[in-house]
């Protein structure tokens, strides 16, 4: 797998969960002899929702909710066969979306 690069994008709603998963991937890749670039924190997406509290009148009474999506980017440079096998067997926490691309 010479001149290959594995790019891993992680998404989660909980920043502690995404940091723990990122650290686990970095440790696994370094243990198998690959070089890791990152983790690079990407911009956090904040979605805000405003909901009327009253079912009929009182337009001034509203609740506001926010959901944050945290993202991280990892590049594994010059991965070995052991690196790919270890990453495939890695069991990450539920709630973390993982996108893997070869480049």
Curated annotation (Swiss-Prot):
Keyword annotations of the record: Ribonucleoprotein, Ribosomal protein
SMART domains listed in its UniProt record: Ribosomal_S10 (SM01403)
Gene Ontology biological process terms, A to Z: translation
Pfam families for the chain: Ribosomal_S10
Gene Ontology cellular-component terms listed: ribonucleoprotein complex; ribosome
Entry function: Involved in the binding of tRNA to the ribosomes.
Quaternary context: Part of the 30S ribosomal subunit.
Similarity comment: family membership: Belongs to the universal ribosomal protein uS10 family.
Protein name, UniProt field: Small ribosomal subunit protein uS10
Species annotation: Saccharophagus degradans (strain 2-40 / ATCC 43961 / DSM 17024)
């Amino acid at each position: 797998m010479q001149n290959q690069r594995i790019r891993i994008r992680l998404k989660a709603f909980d920043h502690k969960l995404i940091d723990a998963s990122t650290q686990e991937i970095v440790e696994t890749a370094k243990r198998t002899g690959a070089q890791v670039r990152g983790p690079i924190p990407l911009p956090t997406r904040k979605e805000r929702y405003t909901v009327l509290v009253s079912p009929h009148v009182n337009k001034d009474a509203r609740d506001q909710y926010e959901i944050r999506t945290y993202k991280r980017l990892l590049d594994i440079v010059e991965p070995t066969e052991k690196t790919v096998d270890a990453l495939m067997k890695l069991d990450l926490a539920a709630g973390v979306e993982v996108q893997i691309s070869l480049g």
